[in-house]
Amino acid sequence: MNNEIYLFGNICGDSDVIVDQLIENGQKFDLILTDPPYNINKDFGNNSDCLPLDDFINITNERIKKLKQVLTPTGSIIWFGIHNYICYVQVAMYNAGLFYRRMNIWHYENGFSRSTKEPATHYEPFLWFSNDKKKWVYNCDEVRIPYKSTERLKSPVKYHA
């Protein structure tokens, strides 16, 4: 592995239009990382977060089908969501023919909720799906976090490539 990162760049505009252009141009990506609107009924000025559930599910299905078209054969999609809607995204990924790798959690110390009537959420789930069932890229050494306390390990962990 050459440890190079290729940056496509920031693209501003309607992501649905942009993805259509990428499909037309034959662009392919090894990784798509997306953090789309969560449909949590908040007013961000464009109604993208206030859809009826059926519309949210249909739009999510269409977006994932399009994103699959711009994945390389060994490419992956990482999709951030919110706990009460991520299940619909997961089903859409399966329906698009993608393969489940993991659901992980992004944990943060300070939650986003300003509510005093319920606990703040201190995490966001994200899904990792690949385009191929047996071949995908995952560079574990680059993302591995060392143990904070090695004293609790009875024997060193050995990884085999």
Where are these regions (language model features)?
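Core catalytic lobe of class I
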Residues: M1-A161
